[in-house]
Each structure stands twice: as structure tokens, then as C-alpha cells.
Curated annotation (Swiss-Prot):
InterPro entries: Kinase-like_dom_sf (IPR011009), LKB1_c (IPR039154), Prot_kinase_dom (IPR000719), Protein_kinase_ATP_BS (IPR017441), Ser/Thr_kinase_AS (IPR008271). This is Serine/threonine-protein kinase STK11. Its cofactor is Mg(2+); Mn(2+). Catalytic component of a trimeric complex composed of STK11/LKB1, STRAD (STRADA or STRADB) and CAB39/MO25 (CAB39/MO25alpha or CAB39L/MO25beta). ATP binds at residues 55-63, 78. It comes from Gallus gallus. It is an enzyme of class 2 (transferase). The gene is STK11.
Length: 440
């Protein structure tokens, strides 16, 4: 701006200067006048699923909420990055194992795998699961006592035994039963989750002998703490369920230590005490499940026949409720995908690119495996590739993985912008699908 222009501008009043042009001046304001608002994320579609907000994060990846645009069912998705899995010992193997196990399990107390989606370009895998509103450990942490009333603990424990009995009937040893791996639905149904370290016994195995364990240290039995080469897999789960019952009824752990070595030393000795307020029936059940000798440790059938298990307990204390969401403080745990769904219904073809993001190269694997991976039970002895009769991985748009476009995301966007009719048609069909589901 030269001297002449500045002199001319000096002749204007403040109100007139404001109307000259916002890009001409930088107006300084007091910091108290600034309203800071978090940037609103755009809606994101992964195949037929509308992405919601973050539910939690673990060592393997993030867990987010999802909405199925066809059924309007609430889902949870575990987002796994291949690069991150490679940095975790047995990371990729554990994920593949969990998918192979979950795809053949159907029980009300075992988490259900709904879909497996794969993005080759981003090297991401999406494990779509049934939605659970809260984890048991989160509920325990929300109260000072860190425990449940006996009535509530009994209800959860009975469901845990139901789910555990089903897993054992399918020849599966979970190996990591603990409150952190037990999820709850909105109606209070318990779901056993996280089968990443589980082991499927051979169909013709003589017994339940196992040789490896990767479970949480505080829930491991003496035979593992003492370093035995082989052990009974089912009795490991019984022990872990016993530690879980001890924890949810007392708020304590039967064995503790300043470090893992001291913890395993205490577990290896097998000496523990039970608070007196537990009462004789519960104390007897805990001693049976936490028996040092695996051969004498309670079986599922003995647990079911125990007086404490069969007794109908009175509701003497207030139940521990599902706590508010730690992220939003929403006590109702409302569906986080709703705001993004509203954005899609406010659709304008001219604002298509600003409305939502779509991951195009999503592969839906019909057999719940990573594209190119042959399930162990279906692989031939000679290691040949998938047979002609086996299901193939297909993309959401109907193409096969080999037919996927190698264009970058920027190139695909440019291609879409050069063909506005195709872009508008694609977006309109997706939103029309959502609108139809909402009306139904």
C-alpha cells in the first residue's frame, strides 16, 4: 500500500474502513473476545458404514463407533494398521488368529464379528464388531469400591461361565479372561472379547494341553508362573475366571507384587487370603477355582453345581450403573454417528467434496480373512493358493483386488471433479440409501 492510498484511507471513519475489505486489514482484538471451537470432523464412509467417534484405544489400534447405513445397526470397529502390527510381537498372527476364531463362533456371551474390511492403499484393516456400550473394567473404575454388589457380580459371573463353557465346547482356550476383556451391551449382556491370544485345540487332540501363554500376568495360574512347559488350557481359563470373580466381588486381587517377578513369585506359591465379608459360600467357590493343583481345580460343571452359583441373590445394594462416556461426558452414551448422519442429510451436490470423505478401495473379505490369505483349515498340504470353489475377496464396488485402481487419492479426486455427473450420482446414491433406511 503506497502513501497516496494510505492518505485516502485516513479520510474514512472506522465503520467505513470495516466495509473496505476484510482481506485488506488485520484487526487486532482482545483474547477474551476469541471463541475457541474444536474443528468439526467431516463425515466419513467406509464401505457401507458411517464412521462415528472414538470409543477407546489399545496396543493394537483404535476402536470407533460405526453406523451400518443399510440396517442402521450400531457397530464398533477395530482399526488396525499393518505398520503398527509389525512392531508388536506376534501382532499380525494374533489378529489373523482372532478373525479365524470369531468367524465360526455364535453365542450370546461371545462378541460377534460382523464384517472385515481392508484398504490396500492405506494398509488398514477394519474389524466390524457388534456394539457394546461399556467394558466391565470401566464400570469398576467408576466407583470408589472398585467392585460390584454381590447380586450384580453374580449375574455377570453366570454369563461369563456360559460364554466360557461355549468356547471350551468349541475347543478354544481364551487364555486372557479378565474384566478388561469383558464387554457389556445396553441391556446388560456380557460379551467375552479379545481372542487375540486364544488357542484353538486340534480337533483330534487327546486333551486340552497347551504350551504357550500371553495373558495378563495378574490373571495367570501357578503352573504358568512357575514356568511349566505344558499345562491344561481349560484350567487356565478357570483360574482367570476365579481371579476375575475375586476382583469384581472384593475390589482386590488375590495376588499382588511390586513387579512382575514378585507377582509371579507370589502366584507360584499359591497362598492368598479372602476377605471375611465374602461369606462361606463365595469363599468356598473362590478356593475351588483358585486351587493350586490344576487337577483338583474346579471344572465348569463343578462351578455350575456350587451353591453360590445356583443361589438367587437378593439385591441388597445399589447396582453400579454404566458410567458417562469419558470423552463426551454423555451419561446416555448416545450414538456418536448421528451428527455426521445429519451432515449427510444436509447434502448439496455443489459441496460434495466438503461434505464427507469416502475410502473407495475397500475390500470386503467374504471369508473374514486378509486378501490373499488362505485360511489354515482350507489350505492344502502342498501350500497351494485358494481353490476355485473358495470365496474370493471382493471390493465394495464389485471388483476384485487385482482390478483396484492404482491411482493416488489426489488423482481420484481430480478424476471425479472432471466428471461431475458421476460424482454427484455416486454421492446421491449413498445419501439416498441412508435416507431410505432412516424412513424405514
Amino acid at each position: 500500500m503506497d502513501m497516496q492510498e494510505s492518505q485516502q484511507l485516513g479520510m474514512f471513519g472506522e465503520s467505513e474502513l470495516m466495509s473496505v475489505g476484510m482481506d485488506t486489514f488485520i484487526h487486532r482484538i482482545d483474547s477474551t473476545e476469541v471463541i475457541y471451537q474444536p474443528r468439526r470432523k467431516r463425515a466419513k464412509l467406509i464401505g457401507k458404514y458411517l464412521m462415528g467417534d472414538l470409543l477407546g484405544e489399545g496396543s493394537y489400534g483404535k476402536v470407533k463407533e460405526m453406523l451400518d447405513s443399510e440396517t442402521l445397526c450400531r457397530r464398533a470397529v477395530k482399526i488396525l494398521k499393518k505398520k503398527k502390527l509389525r512392531r508388536i510381537p506376534n501382532g499380525e498372527a494374533n489378529v489373523k488368529k482372532e478373525i479365524q476364531l470369531l468367524r465360526r463362533l455364535r453365542h450370546k456371551n461371545v462378541i460377534q464379528l460382523v464384517d472385515v474390511l481392508y484398504n490396500e492403499e492405506k494398509q488398514k484393516m477394519y474389524m466390524v464388531m457388534e456394539y457394546c456400550v461399556c467394558g466391565m473394567q470401566e464400570m469398576l473404575d467408576s466407583v470408589p469400591e472398585k467392585r460390584f454388589p454381590v447380586f450384580q457380580a453374580h449375574g455377570y459371573f453366570c454369563q461369563l461361565i456360559d460364554g466360557l463353557e461355549y468356547l471350551h465346547s468349541q475347543g478354544i482356550v481364551h487364555k486372557d479372561i479378565k474384566p478388561g476383556n469383558l464387554l457389556l451391551t445396553t441391556n446388560g449382556t456380557l460379551k467375552i472379547s479379545d481372542l487375540g491370544v486364544a488357542e484353538a485345540l486340534h480337533p483330534f487332540a487327546e486333551d486340552d494341553t497347551c504350551r504357550t501363554s500371553q495373558g495378563s500376568p495378574a490373571f495367570q495360574p501357578p503352573e504358568i508362573a512357575n514356568g511349566l512347559d505344558t499345562f491344561s488350557g481349560f484350567k487356565v481359563d478357570i483360574w482367570s475366571a476365579g481371579v476375575t470373580l475375586y476382583n469384581i466381588t472384593t475390589g482386590l486381587y488375590p495376588f499382588e507384587g511390586d513387579n512382575i517377578y514378585k507377582l509371579f513369585e507370589n502366584i507360584g506359591k499359591g497362598d492368598f487370603t479372602i476377605p471375611e465379608d465374602c461369606g462361606p459360600p463365595l469363599s468356598d467357590l473362590l478356593r475351588g477355582m483358585l486351587e493350586y493343583d490344576p487337577a483338583k481345580r474346579f471344572s465348569i460343571q463343578q462351578i455350575r453345581q456350587h451353591n453360590w452359583f445356583r443361589k438367587k441373590h437378593a439385591q441388597a445394594e445399589t447396582l453400579v450403573p454404566i458410567p458417562p462416556s469419558p470423552e463426551t461426558k454423555d451419561k446416555w452414551r448416545s450414538m456418536t454417528a448421528v451428527p455426521y448422519l445429519e451432515d449427510l442429510h444436509g447434502y448439496n451436490e455443489d459441496e460434495d467434496d466438503d461434505l464427507y470423505d469416502i475410502e473407495d478401495d475397500i475390500i470386503y473379505t467374504q471369508d473374514f480373512t486378509v486378501p490373499g490369505q488362505v485360511p489354515e483349515e482350507e489350505a492344502g498340504q502342498n501350500g497351494q493358493s485358494r481353490g476355485r470353489g473358495l470365496p474370493k475377496a471382493i471390493c465394495m464396488n464389485g471388483t476384485e483386488p487385482g482390478q483396484l485402481s492404482t491411482k493416488s487419492k489426489a488423482e481420484r479426486r481430480a478424476s471425479a471433479s472432471s466428471n461431475p455427473s458421476r460424482k454427484a450420482c455416486s454421492a446421491s446414491s449413498k445419501i439416498r440409501k441412508l435416507s431410505t433406511c432412516k424412513q424405514q
